[in-house]
């Protein structure tokens, strides 16, 4: 379930006018920006942007980008984007940084539905005049490149049919490849990038039943390389995204110096989807409410905005 609290009735024109006053007056009114945008869903934000452009012949994103700063600006800017366009931006930033590129690309590729992933790929082409797979191929090499390109171009069956015989045979294929340390085996990439999530869950369950250990734990042996870590991330995203995102948040908050990029990414992308469920997983794992952990590690308008998206006013 979502944490976003948005009103059923709103006026896009009134919101656009209020936002104009917030960014064009004497000093930016950050509280007004948070109170409006932090309580509007994707459809409502799209209407506000359209109304703003019609009224002022300017995209709302431009004054937000120029008048706000730091982590607060980044969070508000990405939140205001259309979800598919936002993911295109996240993918491009990850690719260009070339560090931990696989985490963001795998999240987008493995957690979205086939239609959502297709929308992200279209948004990426429209924004950057390249395909995401083209840019990925240019900035990665070897087995990581093979895996990421296969995942980002996948269009999986999205139904609930399970082939038990196939789950059994592919659990054996995965076990043999891992046992032989053939982590770059083409069959692993084929299975992870073509099977439906329902089918993969059946395969992973069969693997655990047969081997007495989950496939994700089996991959993260001592000295695991980047490709093994990427496989592990893909399996976690496909199998249990809520637990995956809880760990991303935990790592972002508990590291020395908060990882604001990861913290912003999870809260902004999940607030309208399943952030309430992720909060529950976080509390069970850490015995601390996520809002409390975020409030302790952030400050100012950035903190206020994240807490608003988490459903808790500062």
Curated annotation (Swiss-Prot):
Positions that bind Ca(2+) 1: 25, 27, 67
Membrane-spanning parts: none
Q: Which Gene3D superfamilies match?
A: Annexin
UniProt lists the family membership as follows: Belongs to the annexin (TC 1.A.31.1) family.
Q: Which organism is it from?
A: Fragaria ananassa
Matching entries from InterPro entries are given as: Annexin (IPR001464), Annexin_repeat (IPR018502), Annexin_repeat_CS (IPR018252), Annexin_sf (IPR037104), AnnexinD_plant (IPR009118)
Q: Where are the Annexin repeats?
A: 10-81, 82-153, 165-236, 240-311
The protein depicted here goes by the name: Annexin-like protein RJ4
Is RNA-binding included in the keywords of this UniProt record?
A: no
List GO terms (cellular component aspect). Answer: cytoplasm; plasma membrane
The record lists Ca(2+) 2 as bound by: 253, 255, 257, 297
